[in-house]
């Protein structure tokens, strides 16, 4: 059986100095026989999804100690993509994922911790911690801060979120008073933004990967029920330590739980619920850390057979995460997928022997456990707050309507094919991705004229300046991992196209990426990126581009001979933006760009450059 990793610094005469330091943190003689469990928290006052996490690490710590472990908390950084959006701050968002992963590795390995509880929530924090957990491969439990309640206003018949505020702000026909009302109402509580944006998508996927508890992705940040997830996570971490270090059961290690089948399950869920395209980027990165051979071709294969069973904002205004929870949360979607023969149910989770066992217990349409039904009735209170667990509101009933409800059965799916698709063609030889859940069926096949912008800033200026017309395909390039650097999100360009009434009359293609709040014919992650010699860098104004989602293709309608001539000319000039950009790129960002791969590889570091 494996020894505690922590024995490296807690046992032996030569570790007297280390033990002296451990004692200075509060450890006693009896503690040196216990597992040391790291709590990776991500509290910050900069991010609404993390503002309520300050005391939750210690909540978990006390539970770890009651269960027989030693808890040691540390913090990571967290970037708010919404606040960093639309300016050079967004250059730092994706690179922060690598910093978070590294910081968790540094702290856990430097202090020889035996296990981790990861307290995450927003866009890059969950992926960064997931990458670290799979890299370290020691027992881990994820517990997130939970989603925000949807906003409410008398000016709208539906729940509000961040994107609503952005769209009305860019709409010249909206009064200042309406904009102010939306601004004050869109984000009423702590928690990750209320739709199926990147943060909530990733927290849901940790359930499908088997690394978090049921309800992790959908239980509101404000609801009292969420406290139980934190308490259970602390106890479970100690239990996993006992199974691995005490009994030699390596099935509890994250790489044995998050195996190839589990990654397929996670992507299947993502496609079925119309999650953010960013999840593709993050799952590919996590798979590389886990040494799982899961790539874009697997995602393409799954996207052709998995139906869309759930539609949530920004893909539909009617539903937000609180509605997903009322409909039974993630395990109800997984249950429908399992009954459709689309899920691997023999994989283990941190909390159940198999996914089949977990579905039997947690799917509201299958279980008779009244406690489970009560759990999924947890709803919003509609009271602005930054305090976790501050309300105990219940829906009067569950949404178990699988024909017309928030979550559908396979037979009543919103669409036969799921909410994400991978497109290939001469403009993106290694692929690009589109969130089909947010694309109107009338433009699933779209041919248009290329309108070139060498940066997101230029595109925003062009769209707001009415340079973009109906029938245009906006091309935003040199915004990939290397070219940006940092692969900015393009939420402002897509939101402004909507506000200009062009949401169904234009398309957008970029080697950058999109916010989970994006909808419309928005195609990102074009690989190879322009800065790496990708064909997106060869497109010229007025070129015709054909997008064909049903046939999973995207092509520049230019002859091979012409493309070859353009490539030779670009090789001579160098793969850089044609127009200069007023962008200050720091040393930290240059270091990221030096090692970054294109999006089809998850925008992770190119290890070949490190290994020589």
From Swiss-Prot:
Which residues are [2Fe-2S] cluster-binding? 122, 193
Pathway involvement of the protein, from the record: Amino-acid biosynthesis; L-isoleucine biosynthesis; L-isoleucine from 2-oxobutanoate: step 3/4; Amino-acid biosynthesis; L-valine biosynthesis; L-valine from pyruvate: step 3/4
| Sites bearing N6-carboxylysine, chain numbering | 124
Tell me a GO biological process for this protein: isoleucine biosynthetic process
Entry GO terms, CC: cytosol
Example of a GO MF term: 2 iron, 2 sulfur cluster binding
- Residues annotated to bind Mg(2+): 81, 123-124, 489
**Catalytic activity from the UniProt record:** (2R)-2,3-dihydroxy-3-methylbutanoate = 3-methyl-2-oxobutanoate + H2O; (2R,3R)-2,3-dihydroxy-3-methylpentanoate = (S)-3-methyl-2-oxopentanoate + H2O
Under the heading SUPFAM superfamilies, the entry gives: IlvD/EDD N-terminal domain-like, LeuD/IlvD-like
Cofactor(s) required, per the database record: [2Fe-2S] cluster; Mg(2+)
Q: What is its EC number?
A: 4.2.1.9
Record Pfam families: ILV_EDD_C, ILVD_EDD_N
- List the catalytic residues: 515
Any note on cofactor binding? Binds 1 [2Fe-2S] cluster per subunit. This cluster acts as a Lewis acid cofactor.
Q: Answer whether the UniProt record assigns the keyword Protein biosynthesis to this protein.
A: no
What top-level branch of life does the organism fall under? Bacteria
Report quaternary structure and partners: Homodimer.
Described purpose of this protein according to its UniProt entry: Functions in the biosynthesis of branched-chain amino acids. Catalyzes the dehydration of (2R,3R)-2,3-dihydroxy-3-methylpentanoate (2,3-dihydroxy-3-methylvalerate) into 2-oxo-3-methylpentanoate (2-oxo-3-methylvalerate) and of (2R)-2,3-dihydroxy-3-methylbutanoate (2,3-dihydroxyisovalerate) into 2-oxo-3-methylbutanoate (2-oxoisovalerate), the penultimate precursor to L-isoleucine and L-valine, respectively.
Name of the protein this chain belongs to: Dihydroxy-acid dehydratase
Q: Which gene encodes it?
A: ilvD
């Amino acid at each position: 059986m494996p020894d505690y990793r922590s024995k490296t610094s807690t046992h032996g005469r030569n570790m007297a100095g280390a033990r002296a330091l451990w004692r200075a943190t509060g450890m006693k003689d009896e503690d040196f026989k216990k597992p040391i469990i790291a709590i990776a928290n991500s509290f910050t006052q900069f991010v609404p999804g993390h503002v309520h996490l300050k005391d939750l690490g210690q909540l978990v710590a006390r539970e770890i100690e009651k269960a027989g472990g030693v808890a040691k908390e540390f913090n990571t950084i967290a970037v708010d993509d919404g606040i960093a959006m639309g300016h050079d701050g967004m250059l730092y968002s994706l690179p922060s994922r690598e910093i978070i992963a590294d910081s968790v590795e540094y702290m856990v390995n430097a202090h020889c911790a035996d296990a981790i509880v990861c307290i995450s929530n927003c866009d890059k924090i969950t992926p960064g911690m997931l990458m670290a957990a799979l890299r370290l491969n020691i027992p881990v439990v994820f517990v997130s801060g939970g989603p925000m309640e949807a906003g409410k206003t008398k000016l709208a018949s539906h729940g509000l979120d961040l994107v609503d505020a952005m769209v009305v702000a860019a709409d010249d026909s909206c009064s200042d008073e309406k904009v102010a009302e939306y601004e004050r109402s869109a984000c009423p509580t702590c928690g990750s933004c209320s739709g199926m944006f990147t943060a909530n998508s990733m927290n849901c996927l940790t359930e499908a990967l088997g690394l978090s508890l049921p309800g992790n992705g959908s239980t509101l940040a404000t609801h009292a029920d969420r406290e139980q997830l934190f308490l259970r996570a602390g106890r479970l971490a100690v239990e996993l330590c006992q199974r691995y270090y005490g009994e030699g059961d390596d099935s509890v290690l994250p790489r044995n739980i998050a195996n190839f089948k589990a990654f397929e399950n996670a992507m299947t869920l993502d496609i079925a619920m119309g999650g953010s395209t960013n999840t593709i980027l993050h799952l590919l990165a996590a798979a590389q850390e886990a040494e799982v051979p899961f790539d874009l071709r697997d995602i393409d294969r799954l996207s052709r057979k998995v139906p869309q069973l759930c539609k949530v904002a920004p893909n539909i205004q009617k539903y937000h995460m609180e509605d997903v929870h009322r409909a039974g949360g993630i395990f109800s979607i997984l249950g429908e997928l399992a009954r459709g023969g689309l899920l691997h149910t023999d994989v283990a989770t941190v909390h159940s022997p198999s996914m089949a066992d977990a579905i039997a217990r947690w799917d509201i349409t299958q279980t008779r456990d009244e406690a489970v039904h009560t759990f999924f009735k947890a709803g919003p209170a509609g009271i602005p707050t930054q305090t976790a667990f501050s309300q105990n509101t219940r829906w009067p009933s569950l949404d178990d309507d699988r024909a017309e409800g928030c979550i559908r059965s396979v037979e009543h799916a919103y669409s036969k094919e799921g909410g994400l698709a991978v497109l290939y063609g001469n403009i993106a030889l290694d692929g690009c991705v589109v969130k089909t859940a947010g694309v109107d069926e009338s433009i699933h096949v779209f041919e248009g004229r290329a309108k070139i912008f060498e940066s997101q800033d230029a595109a925003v200026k062009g769209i707001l300046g009415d340079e973009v017309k109906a029938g245009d395909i906006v091309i935003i390039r040199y915004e990939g991992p290397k070219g940006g650097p940092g692969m900015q999100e393009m939420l402002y360009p897509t939101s402004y196209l909507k506000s200009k009434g062009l949401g169904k009359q234009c398309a957008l293609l970029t080697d950058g990426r999109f916010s989970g709040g994006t909808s419309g014919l928005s195609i990102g992650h074009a690989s190879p990126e322009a800065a790496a010699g990708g064909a997106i860098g060869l497109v010229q104004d007025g070129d015709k581009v054909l997008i064909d989602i049903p046939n999973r293709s995207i092509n520049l309608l230019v002859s091979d001979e012409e493309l070859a001539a353009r490539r030779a000319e670009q090789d001579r000039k160098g793969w850089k933006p044609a127009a200069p950009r007023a962008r200050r790129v720091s040393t930290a960002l240059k270091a990221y760009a030096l090692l970054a791969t294109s999006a089809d590889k998850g925008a992770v570091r190119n290890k070949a450059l490190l290994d020589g």
